[in-house]
């Protein structure tokens, strides 16, 4: 079980990995995306958050979730994962490296729907930087909800593959992963 708490003047967030699936951020679409991430990654996720502005909650949940994921022991993990996820009119393709180097590269646009594109991309980027995930994500489609959900599912499935235990060594020529 990994836990990370973050309390600032703007937000209060607690993320626990390895417990029951329970998410309450006060932002319905963010809750939906976090539950989707949990279900498709196989990571039991408990998130409780409150804050002054949606943007601050979205950002700080991503920071806390990223820090919790960064605490996972990478020894023996597969490290890499990928997925192609179609969803109605949308499709998302993800390649992921749990390298300790947090980089997000996105090809395509999401548009504004239940969550503004800017906030969605900021969530993904902040998550990647804090977790140490290198994520390449390509998305196509016309419905912003479907594109965002397909993207989260693709990241989740890729993460599930990367977190698969396969031996006792680090998957790195350096012999270590940050």
Swiss-Prot record:
Keywords: Amino-acid biosynthesis, Cytoplasm, Histidine biosynthesis, Lyase. The gene is hisB. Its main location: cytoplasm. It catalyses: D-erythro-1-(imidazol-4-yl)glycerol 3-phosphate = 3-(imidazol-4-yl)-2-oxopropyl phosphate + H2O. It comes from the Archaea. GO terms for cellular component: cytoplasm. InterPro entries: IGPD_sf, ImidazoleglycerolP_deHydtase, ImidazoleglycerP_deHydtase_CS, Ribosomal_Su5_D2-typ_SF. Disulfide bonds: none annotated. GO terms for molecular function: imidazoleglycerol-phosphate dehydratase activity. Belongs to the imidazoleglycerol-phosphate dehydratase family. It is found in: Cytoplasm. It comes from Archaeoglobus fulgidus (strain ATCC 49558 / DSM 4304 / JCM 9628 / NBRC 100126 / VC-16). It holds the Pfam family IGPD. Its EC number is 4.2.1.19. The keyword Manganese does not apply. This is Imidazoleglycerol-phosphate dehydratase. GO terms for biological process: L-histidine biosynthetic process. The keyword Cell membrane does not apply. Pathway: Amino-acid biosynthesis; L-histidine biosynthesis; L-histidine from 5-phospho-alpha-D-ribose 1-diphosphate: step 6/9.
């Amino acid at each position: 079980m990994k836990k990370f708490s973050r309390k600032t003047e703007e937000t209060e967030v607690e993320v626990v990995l390895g417990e029951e699936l329970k998410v309450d951020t006060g932002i319905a679409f963010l809750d939906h995306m976090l539950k989707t991430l949990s279900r498709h990654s196989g990571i039991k996720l408990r998130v409780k958050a409150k804050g002054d502005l949606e943007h601050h909650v979205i950002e700080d949940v991503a920071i806390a979730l990223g820090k919790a994921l960064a605490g996972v022991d990478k020894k023996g993990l597969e490290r890499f994962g990928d997925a192609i996820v179609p969803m109605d009119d949308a499709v998302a393709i993800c390649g992921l490296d749990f390298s300790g180097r947090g980089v997000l590269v996105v090809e395509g646009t999401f548009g504004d729907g239940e969550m503004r594109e800017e906030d969605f991309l900021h969530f993904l980027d902040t998550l990647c930087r804090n977790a140490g995930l290198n994520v390449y994500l390509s998305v196509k489609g016309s419905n912003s909800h479907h594109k965002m959900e397909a993207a989260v599912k693709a990241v989740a499935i890729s993460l599930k593959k990367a977190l698969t235990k396969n031996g006792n060594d680090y998957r790195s020529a350096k012999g270590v992963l940050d």
